[in-house]
Amino acid sequence: PRIPEDEERFTFSTVCRSNGLSSRLIISGYTQGSFPWPDAKDADAGLYPWGRLFPCTILKTGRVNLTHSMRRRVRDAVHRHYSGLELEILLDYDFDEVIEAIAEYHRKRSNGTWMTRDMIDMWKALHRQRIAHCVSVHIDGELAGGLYFTSVGRMLYGEKQCSPFVQTHPACSRRTGSLCSMA
């Protein structure tokens, strides 16, 4: 079968708009399969389009099985690429730093970012409510990459990730960049 081009892979369908964000609105939207995604023009106007992304990937974690050989391959790759470096993978350690780094990373890669200051502040508030979480990767004490996600009920909703450290640290390469992003 033919693999679609990047722009053909996903379709974002707007289902509604809101004039602001709140924890209640985020939770309600996520439980209905929708999430806010403003562009620069919407953000300047204070509007938040809510939509759905098709196709949507759902991983049933009860069925995920990391085989012994897969765990060994990951461990060996980490040892091979990070030998002599202090590597830490942390959960919920530095949410504010991670989300700010993600926003900056995506701002530099495009003309602006869909992550408005209001959205960043909202996810920080959701983190304080133990709804939003992060995983961060640190190399020699410096943030190397991270991701954040939202937990509502029994579902985890993956958000954005970044690996800004990959371009600057001599020990990082394209292969290790993928490991940082997957953290």
Predicted features and spans:
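N-acyltransferase acceptor-side catalytic subdomain
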Residues: 1-183
